Amino acid sequence: METTEASMNNITDISETLLIPLYCRARETQSKNPLINDRKAVEITEKLNSVFATSTSPLHRRLAKGKLRRSANKKFTVFLAIRTRKFDRYCQEFLSRTPNGVIVELGCGLSSRFSRIDNGAVEWYDLDLPEVIAIRKQFFQETARSHMIASSVFDFQWMEQIAKTKNTILFIAEGLLMYLCEDDVKSPVLEIQHRFPGCDLVCEVENMFVINVLKKERWRKKFQQDYHLGPDVTMHFGIRDGKDFEHWGQGIRFLDEWTIFDDHEKKLGWMNLFACSKRLRKAQWIVHYQLQSL
């Protein structure tokens, strides 16, 4: 595992956030009445724990001890598991309509979604930065229908590999866009629309009020401390309404949206009360668009 430890030292603070959902999926899988079943996440975290236990990184050491954040640890795990489950369902619904469709996971990290929703026909692309894909290749192998692309989402050359397909495409972005600025979100979305008209985009978004709170140093530092994150990690991009992307240009059509509290999941417990507050209910949520031709 020395190779993995060296690779982890080469990624940015923001890329390192991929470890948090990974550990949440593993922890939830091993819980009573799990909401998701991600044995691959369990396998990976068990291998990482032996390295992280003696790491110089506070985040690594905390993860090895099963401490994902400073407070509401179990609820946070459930929160991310519900989010993961919903993205899985979006993919499954897409494949029920187009069984031989193409799914592109932007900022994939160490996601094992392909193994959970593979219907035997889907063409799958996992895209992330080269240093992240280098780590990913230590745990995953490419197959005839599952591919890895080592690229920044801003380097549009990666789209040329996807462009070879003639099938319908779904792009998903879980835990990615909020760490970018608006122009860095808008630019690839418009390019995807231009190159792949008719595709779907499902992405997680942050509410603008959360972004404004994190602009204050006190709250930004608290956010970083709660999750044991590096000083460069903060959120930049947010929206106020699910239809905000439609203002970026013609052909972007809002289809639907979903919040964590829409499932009324019992394992959330007292956090379900947040559904009573419009602001808290949509502090972070998922939006679904179709990117039509211009």
Q: What is each PLM-predicted segment?
A:
Residues 1-104, 108-149, 162-165:
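Rossmann-like AdoMet
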Residues 179-195:
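A short, conserved alpha-helix within the catalytic core of class I
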Residues 192-209:
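Conserved beta-strand signature within the Rossmann-like core of class I S-adenosyl-L-methionine
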Residues 232-259, 282:
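Short alpha-helix
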